[in-house]
Each structure stands twice: as C-alpha cells, then as structure tokens.
Regions:
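Beta-lactam-recognizing serine transpeptidase/beta-lactamase-like catalytic domain environment
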Residues: 1, 13, 46-116, 120-315, ...
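Conserved beta-strand and immediately adjacent loop positions that scaffold enzyme active sites
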Residues: 39-41, 258
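Conserved, well-ordered alpha-helix/loop/beta-strand core segments that scaffold catalytic motifs
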Residues: 1-38, 46
Length: 320
C-alpha cells in the first residue's frame, strides 16, 4: 500500500500553562524533598478540558531509559553496592523504577485526598439540607467516635464555627460532624455520584480507579475518617473532576485532552464536545459552594490565591 498522510490531533493543552505547571511542580518537589513524585492538573471546570497535566520527576522523551529521580538513582546504586554479583536482580529493579517513572501519576496512582475532599462532604450535606451556611460545629481539638479519638490537624481547637469558617479552618471534627448528619447511606450515594467508584473516562491510557470502603462495610468510624478525606483512595483526575462538579453548577463532566481531529486536507473529522455524565448537586448548592470557597481563599487562613474564571487546580497539604 502507498503511504498516506495521517490525521492531526489537536489537544486542549495550553502550552504556556503546561510549561508553567511543569516548572512550578518541579520546584515544589525540590523544595519539599518529595520522594514519591507529585502531579498537577489544570482543568477548565466548565468544559472538562485539561489545560495542563504534569508529573515530577518526569523523564526526557529523547532519553526515556535513564532514571531521573534522585531517590531512585540512589536506590539502584545501593542495590548494586549491596548485591555486586546480582545482575539479574539489578536489572529487575531498574526495569521496575523505569516503568514507574513512565506512569502518568495524575491518572494511574491512588492517594488519600485529605482536606480537598471536604468540598464533597460539605456540598453533599448542603444538597441534602442536613446543614446550611449558618450551621455551627464545635471543635475541641479532638472528637470521640465510638472507641476512637480523632484529632484535628491543628494542635489547638477551632471552637464553634459556621460552615464557611469550618471550611476555611479545614477542621476535621467539623467535617466528621457534617458526615454524621449526612449518614452512611447518603455519604456513599454522593461518593458514587461524584464518580469516585469508576474511572473518569479521560482519553488517556492506563487510568486507574480508586479503592474505597464499600457501603455495606462502612461503620461510624469509617464514615468519620472518610468525611475528611481519609481511608478512601482516589486518583488525582477523579478528585479534580469531582471538585469541578462542586463549582460548575453541579455537573460531573468527562475530562479530555483531545480537542479535535483534522485530516490532511484540513477538514475537521471529529470534534470532542463537552460530555455531561450527570448532575450531582443543584445549581443553587453549587453557587453556595463557590461563595464558601471564594471566602476561604480571600480570608485569612485560606490556602490558595483566588483565580479568576473556572480554571481549577487541586492540591492538599501533606499534614492534613
């Protein structure tokens, strides 16, 4: 067969944002001595477009067989030093570390989301009307759940606080109380609705899905820890997809990196449109959550700067 030109793939990636994302993420990893790699996703909450996605340490596509992580380099050196005659074992360890660095952490690796998950618990409780913006929650540093004492992340106590203040403080006992008001059945229902029990369907290979406490196995202790982002594990792409639904009117959108496909004559043969999987919360609840989250970042105690428009990047402090 005669060779013929293929089609061109146009991406949603913004090259400037991607460059900035890679640079700042690498700086963050260096400054915090992160030994488990890190990732960052920048997403348009209104459309599902992925504007930037990076993993650090990454690798050079022109030399993908080298090991770039300093930690992994030391691991290989130590293995060779301890096992000088075990060439087969060294090669197996090298292959394992090389394949790990090839993985896109944003879609393949699981983590406990921590405090960023509190928007899911909070929005679900608002939607069910078991709380409102004026509801109050008391933090005395710790809270007793059955035979467990669960502490807040701070060494002190937040005292009595309304919902917005509890979100600003990222208060664990407050969100345990919110989870208790929501209850196991409703909590698990919204956990499913926000997409945490299934892959997002992003148009990239190798997407994983989270590991979570099943509803039939969940007790009041598990509900407590899950309510502030512990016990369940998710992928970063699952978390940012759910977070986007919280603020975009309540719509769970399928994320994507492909914008369109154009043939060699310049004809658009496929355009990737916004795909709404479901509406999780109402427009009204979503508006309340936007109000709360804008207050969080604008008031003292908030953790990230306000960014105009619905571009979304998620993060969480390691001690939360």
């Amino acid at each position: 067969y005669a060779a013929k030109d293929g089609s061109s793939l146009y991406l949603t990636i913004d090259s400037t944002l991607q460059n900035n994302c890679e640079r700042e993420l690498a700086n963050c990893v260096d400054q915090n001595n992160d030994e488990n790699r890190a990732c960052s996703i920048n997403k348009n909450a209104k459309t599902g477009d992925i504007l930037a996605m990076a993993t650090s340490p990454g690798y050079d596509l022109n030399d993908r067989n080298s090991i770039y992580s300093k930690k992994d380099q030391l691991t290989l050196e130590k293995y060779k030093e301890d096992n000088p005659d075990d060439e087969e074992g060294y090669n197996e360890k090298y292959a394992e570390l090389r394949e790990k660095q090839w993985k896109n952490k944003a879609i393949t690796e699981l983590y406990e989301p921590g405090s960023v998950f509190k928007v899911v618990t909070g929005s679900s409780a608002l939607e069910e009307k078991v709380i409102d913006l004026n509801s109050t929650f008391t933090c005395n540093h710790s809270i007793q759940v059955a035979d467990r004492t669960i502490n807040c992340w701070t060494a002190g106590a937040h005292g009595t606080q309304d919902f917005t203040t509890a979100m600003t403080n990222s208060c664990n006992p407050a969100f345990i109380q919110i989870g208790q008001r929501l209850g196991i059945e409703k909590f698990c229902s919204y956990f499913r609705a926000y997409g945490f029990t299934e892959p997002t369907g992003i148009d990239l290979p190798g997407e994983a899905s989270g590991l979570y406490v099943a509803e039939e196995s969940m007790g009041i202790v598990e509900l407590a820890s899950c309510s502030f982002g512990q016990s369940n594990t998710v992928t970063p792409i699952q978390m940012i997809t759910a977070y986007a639904a919280v603020i975009n009117g309540g719509y769970l959108l399928q994320p994507h990196v492909v914008s369109k496909i154009v043939d060699n004559n310049g004809n658009v043969i496929q355009t990737v449109e916004k795909t709404v999987r479901r509406q999780v919360i109402s427009e009204e609840t979503s508006a309340e959550m936007r109000q709360v989250l804008e207050s969080v970042v604008n008031n003292k105690g908030g953790t990230n700067p306000y960014i105009k428009d619905s571009l979304l990047n998620t993060s969480d402090a390691p001690d939360e």
